[in-house]
Swiss-Prot record:
Organism: Actinobacillus succinogenes (strain ATCC 55618 / DSM 22257 / CCUG 43843 / 130Z)
Catalysed reactions, as listed in the record: shikimate + NADP(+) = 3-dehydroshikimate + NADPH + H(+)
Protein name stated in the entry: Shikimate dehydrogenase (NADP(+))
Function: Involved in the biosynthesis of the chorismate, which leads to the biosynthesis of aromatic amino acids. Catalyzes the reversible NADPH linked reduction of 3-dehydroshikimate (DHSA) to yield shikimate (SA).
Disulfide cross-links: none
Record EC number: 1.1.1.25
Pathway, per record: Metabolic intermediate biosynthesis; chorismate biosynthesis; chorismate from D-erythrose 4-phosphate and phosphoenolpyruvate: step 4/7
Catalytic residues in the record: K65
GO cellular component: cytosol
Positions contributing to NADP(+) binding: E77, G126, A127, G128, G129, A130, N149, R150, T151, L152, T153, K154, M213, G238
One term of GO molecular function: NADP binding
Amino acid sequence: MDNYAVWGNPIKQSKSPQIHKIFAEQTKQCMEYKAILGDPEKFETELLRFFADGAKGCNITAPFKERAYSLADEYSERALTAEACNTLKRLQDGRLYADNTDGAGLVSDLERLGWLKSKQSLLIIGAGGATKGVLLPLLQAQQNITLCNRTLTKARDLADKFAPYGNIQAMKLSEIPVQKFDLVINATSLGLQGKTVDIEPEILRLAGAVYDMQYDKGKDTPFVAWAKALGVQNVHDGFGMLVGQAAHSFYLWRGIMPDIKPLLENDLI
């Protein structure tokens, strides 16, 4: 049986093992997928041991996406552009191949929701590894992006890096203008700590739609709950993005694209 896993910290909230179990059953693949709590002090050593022991691939979640990227030997274009990965695959010669399927998962979910329109104004909150993985696909979809972060330097560096691909500007979190954005995306991991983003509430009230890249299956994330409390009508968490990126990772590993509709339309997990 082929072994796979998702690495993160925290990790107990992850639904990835259940998702990939459903994918494996659906496509008749013989594989095992588990969740592993990564040790920040030993992450690289433990991950390399995981592959040395014969594992075929893994997903990477916060806070290890950039560190995992540095361990790879080959990269997809989207991983190279992001300089962060959420997927690793062990090649036949033992080398590691890095990909980033986050952007594909987000774009497919926004399209499913009908929230991805050309040349709309998009506010992204956070400039970490999760953001790096979605900027290229969003810019390729002709989004006009305002990227904000608590520290301006990090947002500016990222905006400068992606400027050749489309319209993107950087802004400090505390200086976001109170205006209507067609879509506001929370790309921070604050929800994992039970926290939400410190921005002017009116920005969410005015938004055409609000999307949280985090999820908490069975209940609202803090960001989603806050947006709903403010009266925002179009609000969604990142479960659809999770399922979408998982499907693209599964395809990279197994060579077959699973059907995500049963997971999104039925309460399977």
